[in-house]
Amino acid sequence: MKTIIAEKPSVAREIARIVGATKREEGYFEGGGYAVTWAFGHLVQLAMPDGYGIRGFVRDNLPVIPETFTLIPRQEKTEKSYKPDSGVVSQIKIISRLFNGSEQIIVATDAGREGELIFRYLYHYIGCATPFVRLWISSLTDKAIRDGLRNLEAGSKYDNLYLAAKARSESDWLVGINGTQALSIAAGHGTYSVGRVQTPTLAMVCARYWENRRFTVEPFWQLHIAADGGDGDTVKFSSTGKWKEMEPATVLYNKVKDS
């Protein structure tokens, strides 16, 4: 049997229909020599600091740089902490059984960096050794799926894509964990979230906000010209340039008027 893993149930359903896996089981479809299962986004994530024995925000613990990153099932937030998402844990068990009982895995997660990471993190977390190939398609038409299945590619072709995604994931963790803890400790109260993407984005929003708040109206001069466009129409033009002083605007105005 071969197992196909898609990134979400809707994609798995379309692929299952094409390969004849019409029998619905818990967490997958089966039939025609295939099992077609699915993730729902990232089922596996990098462990939080407490996974490395680091609890709370303590200055002496910074920077937090794990020698080796640990993978854990996706967590959900509770009132005081985080716990494994029960639905995710259940799906991982199903996928693990299918992967380890198959002769080959066909990776049908999204054709991109994150899609590759979703599968690889899951594959490594399970500790699977079953060989895998890549279904690389960007459309879910019947033709695209069939063509992709006829032209499966070696999984190793996308090793560098995985490494790029892994580097992004780990850098986000390092910036987020260390930045958040450092800023929160420095502030002395509350938790201040820092992120590789979210913090520069917030800075842009804040900068624009203060530009608007501090904006003061200043007079300027601009050229406006009206010309006969024919058939009784008037064509109006405005200069792209604006001047804070009247003199240079007047000089240009006279040049245009005299030309």
Where are each of the predicted segments found?
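Intrinsically disordered, low-complexity regulatory segments
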Residues: 1-169, 173-175, 179, 240-257
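Prokaryote-biased recognition of long, low-complexity C-terminal linker/tail segments
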Residues: 6, 168, 172-244
